[in-house]
């Protein structure tokens, strides 16, 4: 109804693996875009135009969930929406937002106007340039500096009721629906980073050598052993990721536990492999 190729999570992870092999920052931008669009698709009534634009490649989305007071516990925002005649007004300090200032649409989280607890939340769509929303600082990371994950500030941002992306109080379950996309996509990028390190190291060892003997670096057994460890760690990471996808697609009872294991497994492999490179 809205365009796109109709592919699912496994294809998205494979695409993120491929992008991660070339540019991890671009991979993160693409991942957060996919997560944002997944939120649109889950409740499309008020976001039909951006959903069609995203399918046509004219709209970049992202998530604005993490806050200074809740840090990595993105599912428990500190900010609370205030009911207005037209919808809600939201003020929040979002600690990092990938593609901040560049994305065309932002999926923001806040506690419901009548919230009874930290997980009584809502998700909303906010377009780029909305009054009261701004980038609050630079992105100064040690790595992946190209994804512009800057903090953003929302000051009395007016959001019409039609732009709600969850049922009343339904933000938390919607976030849990998006979590597999985020965690497995992140794992795909990390696996891509590891694969790129293996390929780059292989090219270096087979392409460089010693002029006086004519031998290659790959002829040295200690370097071949390091490369073998890199290859094994990368293959294990990809195999684990495939196993998790199998569980998700089969609706296995431990699927969510497997999803949560995917990110540390793949990121750990990426660190191991790049350290060996």
Predicted regions and their residues:
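Extended, amphipathic, non-transmembrane alpha-helical segments
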Residues: 199-204, 237-243, 271-272
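C-terminal helix-coil-helix/basic helical segment that borders enzyme active sites and/or dimer interfaces
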Residues: 235-265
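A short core secondary-structure module
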Residues: 93-134
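Alpha-helix capping/hinge segments and adjacent helical runs
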Residues: 253, 264-277
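Buried hydrophobic positions in well-ordered alpha/beta secondary-structure cores of metabolic enzymes
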Residues: 15, 36, 90-92, 124, ...
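Glycine-rich beta->alpha junctions and the first turn(s) of the following alpha-helix
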Residues: 141-233
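Glycine-rich flavin
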Residues: 2-98
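Residue-level recognition of alpha-helical structural elements
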Residues: 46-47, 216, 223, 251-258
């Amino acid at each position: 109804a809205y365009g796109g190729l109709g592919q699912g999570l496994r294809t998205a992870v494979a695409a993120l693996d491929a992008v991660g092999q070339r540019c991890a920052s671009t991979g993160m931008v693409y991942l957060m875009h996919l997560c944002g669009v997944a939120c649109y698709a889950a409740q499309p009534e008020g976001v039909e135009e951006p959903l069609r634009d995203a399918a046509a490649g004219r709209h970049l989305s992202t998530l604005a969930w993490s806050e200074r007071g809740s840090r990595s516990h993105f599912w428990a925002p500190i900010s609370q929406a205030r009911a207005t005649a037209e919808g809600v007004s939201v003020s929040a300090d979002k600690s990092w937002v990938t593609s901040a200032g560049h994305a065309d649409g932002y999926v923001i989280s806040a506690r419901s106007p009548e919230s009874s607890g930290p997980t009584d939340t809502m998700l909303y769509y906010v377009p780029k340039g909305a009054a009261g929303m701004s980038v609050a600082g630079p992105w100064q990371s040690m790595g992946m500096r190209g994804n512009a994950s800057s903090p953003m500030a929302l000051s009395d941002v007016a959001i019409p009721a039609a732009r709600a992306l969850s049922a009343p109080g339904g933000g938390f379950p919607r976030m849990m629906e998006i979590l597999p996309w985020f965690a497995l996509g992140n794992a795909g990028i990390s696996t891509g980073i590891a694969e790129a390190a293996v390929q780059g190291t292989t090219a270096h060892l087979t392409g460089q050598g010693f002029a006086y003997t004519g031998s290659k670096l790959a002829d040295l057994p200690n370097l071949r052993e390091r490369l073998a460890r890199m290859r094994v760690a990368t293959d294990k990471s990809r195999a684990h990721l495939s196993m998790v996808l199998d569980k998700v697609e089969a609706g296995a009872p431990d699927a969510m536990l497997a999803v949560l294991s995917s990110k540390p497994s793949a990121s750990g492999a990426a660190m191991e492999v790049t350290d060996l490179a």
